[in-house]
Amino acid sequence: NLYQFKNMIKCTNTRMWWSFTNAGCYDG
């Protein structure tokens, strides 16, 4: 899924995003 992929990238890119989209990271 493009959405999941983008989420993973964002999460790995910045820790701030990780906290904001931790669910996406865990899901991916």
Swiss-Prot record:
Coiled coil: none
CC annotations in GO: extracellular region
SUPFAM superfamilies given in the database record: Phospholipase A2, PLA2 (SSF48619)
GO annotation terms (biological process): arachidonate secretion; lipid catabolic process; phospholipid metabolic process
Keyword vocabulary terms for this entry: Calcium, Hydrolase, Lipid degradation, Lipid metabolism, Neurotoxin, Presynaptic neurotoxin, Secreted, Toxin
EC number(s) per entry: 3.1.1.4
The protein's required cofactors: Ca(2+)
Family assignment from sequence similarity: Belongs to the phospholipase A2 family. Group I subfamily.
The protein's role, per its UniProt record: Snake venom phospholipase A2 (PLA2) that inhibits neuromuscular transmission by blocking acetylcholine release from the nerve termini. PLA2 catalyzes the calcium-dependent hydrolysis of the 2-acyl groups in 3-sn-phosphoglycerides.
Protein name in UniProt: Phospholipase A2 3
